Amino acid sequence: MVTWMLPAGLVASAVVAASSANLGPGFDSIGLALSLCDEIVVETTDSGLVVVVDGEGADQVPMGPEHLVVRAVRRGLQAVGVSAAGLVVRCRNAIPHSRGLGSSAAAVVGGLAVVNGFVAQIDSTPLSNAQLIQLASEFEGHPDNAAAAVLGGAVVSWVDRSYDQPDYCAVPLRLHPDIHLFAAIPEERSSTAESRVLLPARVSHDDARFNVSRAALLVVALTERPDLLMAATEDVLHQPHRASAMSASAEYLRLLRRHNVAATLSGAGPSLIALSTQSELPREAAEYGAANGFIIIKMTAGDEVCWRPEVTVPG
């Protein structure tokens, strides 16, 4: 129930990271924040709604109440028991859309986190990380990207269905310092919903057993034994089924792995994420990617979502 109307003129911001989900076998459970960020700045006003988007998606996303950041801000305000008569929402987007890099999770987590910047100015209690993960995952339907965007770094997430409503949970992992991260981003786009249609409704016991073993090994590889990353990123549940819809990414994935680079689809693709103990990709692999339309970006693990009250509104 709304108990407080925010005054006009309050400003808050959030910076939120991109993320890569699955990392091979960790389907809908393992996520990794990446050092590519969107920034959201929101101001309360006396009435109305204005949405301004710069960068990725500026000509493609809705500019009204359907905008994902707007929906997340309003859901966050509802969760903390406050309201705003009007909003100006400014988004500076660097995370590519529909590429498997968690742009929707970043929008939701950023919108929710902005609310913390508002409640800090009225001496109210901000949303905890657990609440941010829960609310963001309710938008997403799974917690892997949302949890990574909230907590930063690598995470293991799960859904507790012992309650009337799903309880989305996550714990952070300490990513091994010897692991280097590379994203290979194509021009091609793919929506998660479209990609999920390609997945079978049932899998064999052998395939399930294979992925369970690799997902368990992946936690060890990410934290203690990066020399095991090649075996730990093997998957038979989702990537083979998605390959037909993104042939260029599938071919580049095979080439990277032939060069002993632990590459996987990033989320539902078509971007790839590569994890390596080497500081650079093999020359042939890097040249192939560049020649075939992939933008290759060396990254680090992204930070947890950062929110701030009372920032200067950009002109």
Swiss-Prot record:
GO BP, sorted A to Z: threonine biosynthetic process
Gene Ontology, cellular component aspect: cytoplasm
Protein localization: Cytoplasm
Keywords: Amino-acid biosynthesis, ATP-binding, Cytoplasm, Kinase, Nucleotide-binding, Threonine biosynthesis, Transferase
KW Nucleus (keyword) present: no
Pathway assigned in UniProt: Amino-acid biosynthesis; L-threonine biosynthesis; L-threonine from L-aspartate: step 4/5
Highest taxon in the source lineage: Bacteria
Chain residues that bind ATP: 96-106
Pfam family, one: GHMP_kinases_N
Keyword Phosphoprotein: no
Gene3D superfamilies listed in its UniProt record: 3.30.230.10, GHMP kinase, C-terminal domain
Catalyses which reaction(s): L-homoserine + ATP = O-phospho-L-homoserine + ADP + H(+)
Documented EC number(s): 2.7.1.39
Main location: cytoplasm
MF GO annotations: ATP binding; homoserine kinase activity
Family to which this protein belongs: Belongs to the GHMP kinase family. Homoserine kinase subfamily.
Record function comment: Catalyzes the ATP-dependent phosphorylation of L-homoserine to L-homoserine phosphate.
Name of the protein: Homoserine kinase
Species name: Mycobacterium leprae (strain TN)
Taxonomy of the source species: Bacteria, Bacillati, Actinomycetota, Actinomycetes, Mycobacteriales
